[in-house]
């Protein structure tokens, strides 16, 4: 009986503290996979890693959250109060409660403010988002890195060299190379997961593999056969830095990395171990092993 009274008291005390806690607004960048697009009924056709660094002409998804009182959000209002010169981008109602979507149309920084209300009051938060073009990993399979590719600067830095050395032996680095030479079937539809920056469903010009390859005149002619990767590499060396699942697939499009750093901005490339980054590709039906690991 005594234990029950103490337990009840603690529950009521905790509830009282929770109800008295002022809200703390937080804008979260939401990861969205192809499966999530279908589940939520989104018509944007744009997957997202859930990072504030994202590719130009694609979407970033934002949600309103209370990380102070952890109470349900009653109302939320997002305001895009700063964007790059020449941008006509607007925040979009995507049909999900307390979410908004932003499709970048110009490279640069976008600043969004949230005003959020819970039963305990109102609070605000801001976030800076960076839309950029892809630059490619560089220094892959004997093709030297040229600025502004990632390894044109990071080669020779022990921490990065160690990461790169491990990465270049993985499937993420070598899948497209192997696909051209040895797969029983390969088509350009495979590129959206097995290269850097190829349009997933939403058409976007952001210097991804598909954009670079098209500009160079590369056209895949199947079927796969030994030597096709080497022929591609020899004829189109500037496309090789995009022909992997490289740095930017997980860190976000990197063209702003050097320009914003040089101006003293708070911008840095982003990294997260959250599943949303992997889900850009692995949430599809062929990712059964990955799904089972969650």
Regions flagged by a language model, labelled:
Residues 8-17:
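Bacterial N-terminal signal peptides
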Residues 1-6:
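Positively charged n-region of N-terminal signal peptides that target proteins for export
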Residues 7-8, 262:
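Intrinsically disordered, low-complexity segments enriched in polar/charged small residues
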Residues 26-65, 79-274, 280-294:
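Sequence context of c-type cytochrome heme-c attachment sites
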Residues 62-74:
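Acidic, Ser/Thr
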Residues 20-21:
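Boundary of Sec targeting at the N-terminus
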């Amino acid at each position: 009986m005594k234990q029950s009274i103490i337990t009840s008291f603690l529950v009521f005390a905790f509830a009282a503290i929770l109800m008295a806690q002022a809200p703390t607004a937080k804008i979260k960048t939401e990861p969205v996979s192809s499966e999530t697009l279908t589940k939520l009924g989104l018509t944007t056709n744009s997957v997202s890693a859930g990072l504030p660094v994202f590719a130009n002409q694609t979407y970033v998804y934002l949600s309103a959250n209370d990380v102070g009182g952890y109470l349900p959000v009653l109302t939320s209002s997002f305001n895009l109060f700063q964007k790059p010169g020449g941008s006509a981008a607007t925040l979009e109602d995507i049909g999900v409660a307390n979410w908004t979507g932003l499709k970048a149309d110009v490279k640069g920084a976008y600043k969004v403010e949230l005003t959020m209300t819970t039963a305990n009051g109102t609070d605000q938060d801001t976030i800076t988002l960076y839309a950029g073009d892809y630059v490619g990993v560089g220094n892959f399979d004997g093709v030297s890195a040229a600025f502004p590719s990632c390894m044109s600067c990071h080669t020779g830095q022990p921490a990065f060299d160690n990461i790169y050395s491990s990465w270049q032996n993985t499937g993420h680095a070598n899948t497209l190379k192997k696909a051209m030479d040895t797969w029983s079937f390969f088509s350009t539809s495979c590129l959206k997961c097995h290269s850097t920056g190829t349009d997933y469903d939403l058409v976007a010009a952001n210097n991804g593999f598909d954009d670079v390859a098209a500009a160079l005149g590369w056209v895949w002619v199947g079927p796969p056969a030994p030597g096709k990767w080497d022929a591609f590499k020899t004829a189109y060396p500037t496309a090789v830095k995009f022909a992997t699942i490289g740095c930017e697939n997980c860190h976000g499009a990197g063209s702003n990395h050097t320009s914003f750093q040089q101006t003293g901005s708070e911008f840095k490339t982003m990294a997260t171990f959250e599943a949303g980054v992997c889900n850009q590709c692995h949430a599809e039906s062929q990712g059964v092993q990955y799904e089972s690991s969650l």
